[in-house]
Structure formats: C-alpha cells, structure tokens
Amino acid sequence: MSSQTLTAANVFVVLRQLRSLCYPIPSFASSQTIPSRAYSNYNAARHTSLVVPANIAIKQWHFAAAYSTAPPSKTAKESGEDTDLLEPTKPKPKKPVPAWAVQKNALKEKFKEGWKPRKKVSPDTMESIRKLHSMDSVKFSTKNLAEEFKISAEAIRRILKSKWRATEEEEIDRRNRWEKRKLRIQEQMMELGLRHTDPISKEGPSSDMESSHRNKSSSAIESLAGEYLSQSRGQESSPQKRRDPWDVTADDLPGTIRTSTRDAWPQERFPERRGSSQRRTRRDEYIERGPRGKPDW
C-alpha cells in the first residue's frame, strides 16, 4: 500500500507542475492552491511583485514559441501588390483631340436632336392656324397644331399670340412678288427640260406673260437642237439600203476605177447617179459600139 500511495503522490506532483507550466499562477514557488476567495479579495494594495524562477521562464518561453499564433510573414510578391495598391495611380496622358472632333462634340452637345432646321411658315398658313384654333381650341390645340404642321409648339404659341396683320397694300405686294417668283421658277425648270406643262392657272393678268415665256423656252430648245433634229428625222424617214461595192452591174465600164466608197464610183466622173430605169445593159453598149468597139472584159 505504501508503494501505491507514493506513486500516486508523485503523479499528483507531476500533474501540478504541468498545470503550473500551462496555466501560470501568482505563486509559482509554493505548490499550494489558492482558493477562489483570495482572487475576489485581491486589490492593488495587496499586490506583490511576481517572482518567477529562471528555468520556469525559459520553459514558458519555449512553450509560447512552439505554439505561436502570429500571422505568417508576407512574401515579396504579396508585399509588392500591396504597395502598388497603396500608391496613387497616375492618370495616363490623353491624346490630343483634333479640331474636327472638338467641333463635332460641340455640335452634338448643342443640337442633341441632330440636324433639324426650323421650318418656315407662309402668311397664309399662319392665318389658317389662327382660324383653326379660333374654331375649336380643344381639338386644334397647340400640341395638335404643332404635330400637324411639323413645327415646334413654341412657334405655334407665338403665331397665336401675335397680333400683327398685313395691310391691304402689303398683301397685294406680297401676292405680286409670289406670282413673279412662281413664273421665274417655272421658266428655269422649263429651260432645263424638267417640266413641260404649265401648272399655274391661265386665269388672271399673268396668262399672257406665261404663254410668252413658254413660247420663248420652246423656241430656245428648238434652236439648240438645230440641224441635228432635222438630219435625224430625214434619216429616219428615208433609210438608204447599203450597197456592196463589189457587186457587178451594167455601169461597170472599162477604165473605171474601183473604190471602197459606198457608191464605188468617182464623184467627178459620175456627178449624178442614174436611176434603175436609165441603166444601160451590156447588150445596148455592144450594139452602140459595134463589133470593133467591144470592150476588153
């Protein structure tokens, strides 16, 4: 029994020493345990300096080094990436923008809807807009009129708001100017051959002027055509049959010169061609000359 108790006591001593190494307490020198009440009554006045033997401190240092929880040291690559992220990134130098690109961007910013020029409205159209709006302001509202006449709503609003009206003299002057403009445009188109009919009504004082302009334009076209039209018409009316210059006929007499022309005869020798009824046969030629004057065929 004594041997068993001794071995048990030794085991307890070893366990206490191991416990002191793992969980150090204020009194390392004594092997007695400190009750929990002592920790509750502990204060700063009763605090005593901790005295730790040298061998125990070394063992405790080795234990902490073996089970260190410090983060692993960063590699050179990771440290380089961190420094790159921390450093402020320098903006890349922009390429110089050409002048045409600057102008294009400015136009895009100014005209966001693109090329949409303002539409001009004639005085007659403005008067009709006012009449429609006065007839039914709900049906012919500013928005509906703008969609119908393809102009902005602001332009419709200004037309309805304006109180200016042309006098009778100004209206007559405007009508005359418009008539002259129509005639000028029509004359130009007829000279170019783009229009052959007169769309303007013949009623009114300008009918004589229109007819004179039309006659002048037609005569100008005929004079420009000139002889070319007459020649082409003559050729179309009387087409001539092409003659083979190597066909032998009764007109082939000794001493004649064959050529490759269409008539196959020199013009100075035969100025006028004889018709088919006046052609002389070889028999007539032989009878006229007699047997001695027989040609060398």
Swiss-Prot record:
<keyword id="KW-0809">Transit peptide</keyword>
<keyword id="KW-0496">Mitochondrion</keyword>
<dbReference type="Pfam" id="PF06413">
    <property type="entry name" value="Neugrin"/>
</dbReference>
<feature type="region of interest" description="Disordered">
    <location>
        <begin position="189"/>
        <end position="297"/>
    </location>
</feature>
<dbReference type="InterPro" id="IPR010487">
    <property type="entry name" value="NGRN/Rrg9"/>
</dbReference>
<comment type="function">
    <text>Required for respiratory activity and maintenance and expression of the mitochondrial genome.</text>
</comment>
<feature type="compositionally biased region" description="Basic and acidic residues">
    <location>
        <begin position="265"/>
        <end position="275"/>
    </location>
</feature>
<feature type="compositionally biased region" description="Polar residues">
    <location>
        <begin position="229"/>
        <end position="238"/>
    </location>
</feature>
<protein>
    <recommendedName>
        <fullName>Required for respiratory growth protein 9, mitochondrial</fullName>
    </recommendedName>
</protein>
<comment type="similarity">
    <text>Belongs to the RRG9 family.</text>
</comment>
<feature type="compositionally biased region" description="Basic and acidic residues">
    <location>
        <begin position="282"/>
        <end position="297"/>
    </location>
</feature>
<feature type="region of interest" description="Disordered">
    <location>
        <begin position="71"/>
        <end position="97"/>
    </location>
</feature>
<dbReference type="GO" id="GO:0005634">
    <property type="term" value="C:nucleus"/>
</dbReference>
<dbReference type="GO" id="GO:0005739">
    <property type="term" value="C:mitochondrion"/>
</dbReference>
<feature type="transit peptide" description="Mitochondrion">
    <location>
        <begin position="1"/>
        <end position="47"/>
    </location>
</feature>
